[in-house]
Amino acid sequence: MPEATLTKKIIIAIDGPAASGKSTTAKQLAQKLSYTYIDTGAMYRAVTLKVLRDAFFEKIFSDELFLKKLLSETEVILKGEKVFLDGEEVTKDIRTNEVSSKVSKVSSLPLVREKLVEYQRNMGKARGVVMDGRDIGTIVFPDAELKVFMIADAKERAKRRYAELKAKSPSGDPGVTLETLEQEILQRDEDDRTRAIAPLRKPDDARELDTSKMTIEEQVAAIYELATDVISQLK
């Protein structure tokens, strides 16, 4: 497609379970389209990091007034690929296995979702964005012009997360076994699917993409083709 036709901007919503390749693919797709990439998962991870650091994890589930005050005093900002929590860069801190194991529980809280969904909608309302998460196509932007639901085999997702943790560890030790990661991913899937607020589900009008045997480059190319098709049909 000629580049001139790509000047029309759309919202691309990419949803799917943990470690299905959403964030890396969405980031590279945004670069290819010259769009803004919005990592909604990083926002939920930042809030999760805050409650874990301050030992408030249990309290936020039993004291709504406390949670409301905590959220009113919490600022999450995305600047490119960097994530800031209350003025501190936490880009690496939010990717620990501890945060990964707790984020689904924290993001199930209505007050947390309400605050972050409002922020996400404000960021994307100008269009020209690629946003990934669990409920982008169903809750945040149900009117997105392109919705993609990425899936992958749990074993493959565990391998990806294992390689990611290993690469980020100074010692090369991921600090967790592959088997444990697979169990945690399966548990996270269950938590995401069964939570009362904004459960993980494929939007009726989403294109499903199984990434189990796909490289990141192939994933980006597949969604780029879908995006250009959608843009070409805009009047």
Swiss-Prot record:
GO terms for cellular component: cytosol. Pfam families: Cytidylate_kin (PF02224). One of its GO terms (biological process) is nucleobase-containing small molecule interconversion. Transmembrane segments: none annotated. It catalyses: CMP + ATP = CDP + ADP; dCMP + ATP = dCDP + ADP. Keywords: ATP-binding, Cytoplasm, Kinase, Nucleotide-binding, Transferase. It is found in: Cytoplasm. ATP binds at residues 16-24. One of its GO terms (molecular function) is dCMP kinase activity. Its EC number is 2.7.4.25. This is Cytidylate kinase. InterPro entries: Cytidylate_kin (IPR003136), Cytidylate_kinase_dom (IPR011994), P-loop_NTPase (IPR027417). Belongs to the cytidylate kinase family. Type 1 subfamily.
